[in-house]
């Protein structure tokens, strides 16, 4: 893992700004937890942009909008499994998502409100290959009610800690609090010192 000094230098060379860019693509009859999250973040005076993606091409366009926004955090709300994300009855394989986000994720953090998407394969593609700073999400099928509560709590606590830079230690400690509160397992993948390597934190109750 990067040392604290290396992590500080890493961010000093970055021109991103504090904010959460939410991209959601769920089924028509699903509760839009990403939209609900955006409304709560607005109430908390946290900079947020919310977008709904209709298909693969639209998703690729929205990822470019995220890049232009310079927001540091990308939050994705969708259905998923270990090998792909679901969008409007179609699927985006982990490999396809790696391809359309290739020039987008450098020095950014990714948060996935997507069942089983926080796995080593997708993390390796987005963190190790596409240079995202980290990826965080749940490794299980998560009920909507828990998702709708977990993410606002997480972002609220992070915002209380530091709105300028979010360190690895801040994430781990904050996630531990949320995991214990909601009884939800979380996988957190972070950039490593070693080329094409990443570190996984399995954060569980207790």
Q: Where are each of the predicted segments found?
A:
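Structural alpha-beta junctions
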Residues: 41-50, 106, 129-138
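Active-site-proximal C-terminal subdomain of hydrolase catalytic domains
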Residues: 116-206
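Short amphipathic alpha-helical segments and helix-helix/interface helices
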Residues: 38, 63-64, 94-102, 123-127, ...
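Catalytic-core segments of thiol-dependent peptidases
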Residues: 52-119
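Short strand-loop junctions, especially beta-strand C-caps/beta-turns
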Residues: 23-25, 79, 115, 140-141
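Short, conserved loop/helix-junction motifs that constitute active-site signature segments
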Residues: 14, 101-106, 127-130
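Hydrophobic/aromatic beta-strand patches that form the interior of the parallel beta-sheet core
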Residues: 21, 110-111, 134-136
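A domain-level signal for caspase-like cysteine endopeptidase catalytic cores
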Residues: 4-71, 113
């Amino acid at each position: 893992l990067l040392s604290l000094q290396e992590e500080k230098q890493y961010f000093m060379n970055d021109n991103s700004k504090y904010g959460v860019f939410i991209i959601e693509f769920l089924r028509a009859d699903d509760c839009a937890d990403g939209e609900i999250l955006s409304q709560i973040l607005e109430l908390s005076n946290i900079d947020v942009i919310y977008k709904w993606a209709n298909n693969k091409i639209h998703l690729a366009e929205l990822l470019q909008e995220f890049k232009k926004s310079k927001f540091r955090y990308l939050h994705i709300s969708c259905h998923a499994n270990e090998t792909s994300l679901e969008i409007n009855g179609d699927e985006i394989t982990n490999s396809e998502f790696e391809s359309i986000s290739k020039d987008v994720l450098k020095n950014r953090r990714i948060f996935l409100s997507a069942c089983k998407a926080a796995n080593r394969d997708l993390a390796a593609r987005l963190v190790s290959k596409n240079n995202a700073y980290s990826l965080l999400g749940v490794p299980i099928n998560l009920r909507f009610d828990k998702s709708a509560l977990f993410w606002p709590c997480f972002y609220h606590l992070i915002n209380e800690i530091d709105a300028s830079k979010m360190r690895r230690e801040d994430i781990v400690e904050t996630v531990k609090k949320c995991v214990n509160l909601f009884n939800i397992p979380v996988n957190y993948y972070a950039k490593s010192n070693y080329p094409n390597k990443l570190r996984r934190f399995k954060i569980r109750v207790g």
